[in-house]
Amino acid sequence: MSDYSSISFKNNGKLKLLIIVGTRPEIIRLAAVINKTRKYFDVILAHTGQNYDYNLNGVFFHDLQLADPEVYMNAVGADLGETMGNIISESYKLMAAIQPDAVLVLGDTNSCLSVIGAKRLHIPIFHMEAGNRCKDECLPEETKRRIVDIISDVNMAYSEHARRYLADTGLPKERTYVTGSPMAEVLHQNLEKIEASDIHQRLGLEKGKYILLSAHREENIDTEKNFTSLFTAINKMAEKYDMPILYSCHPRSRKRLEQSGFKLDKRVIQHEPLGFHDYNCLQMNAFCVVSDSGTLPEESSFFTSVGHPFPAVCIRTSTERPEALDKACFILAGIDGDHLLQAVDVAVEMNRNGDLGLPVPNYVDENVSDKVVKIIQSYTGVVNKMVWRKY
């Protein structure tokens, strides 16, 4: 049984905030928020251990100048069910021990299920990236989005689309806010380092003459039919464009490729996951970025806004960020070979012709962390009074 008795807040008179993360995307998106909340609140950052090794998580604490988490829960189990159970159990024990005034989570990961314990302990829950919906029930994230949205006391959405989804669910409008995406703030703070990265020299790549690939989502990697379709399409892409395809390869994806025996075209270069500055430098200088990452639309919008547009193609058939399609920031291509090649052609030609789309206003806000601090400070007491009747 885990012992969190040695963990405690500073008790400096400030609001005691517990922030829970477990994956690389959460750390990246929350970086500016974590640093800002540490200025104004008494903060404990807890990592569930859901997705931890240096390349997946540790490098980002370094790149983004984040202090190491105060707590590692080591919640990974023998299988997914055990891991989810451990996350709920360990986070409950931690919260019972340290008694935070509020809990902050972001997104739709297994680590976000920690809010179940917070609800049981009557701790106000604040959820960023609330209301995202892709309407594809095959995605495990879609189920977790609904669970976390409904359990949370205050939902902070990226867009009006997301706010409408929350309203349609019947969640209280008076505790739902549109903050915008936190990614622009993180990217702005790191833009000089991104532009100064020497990753092209280190990898021997010429700017504008390579395709950057990221493919790691469960529906693309773990489903046999989709896996074969996707990587057959990638081989076709290598053959058609005859240039290096740099694949930033998640360990799970690498293991799946090795187990399958699938033979990638020699122009597809598998590389361990890249650091924040290096990956974004590669993005903004690529012939095309082909990715199933949820942040691709946000990154495309941001780099367009600062004069570094890149052709962005998403290898999915649904999106939880329709506002980015509203502004023509990326193309949904799916994983079929012909459709993917058509999408890359269109994205590259439009970029070349200056048909860049427009930045999504909610994706270029630079004060999201300020909004989050003020919402948490404003509503912790309100939730305690109106929901839990504490006073």
Identify the residue ranges that each predicted region occupies.
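Nucleotide-activated sugar donor-binding and catalytic core shared by glycosyltransferases
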Residues: 1-243, 253-391
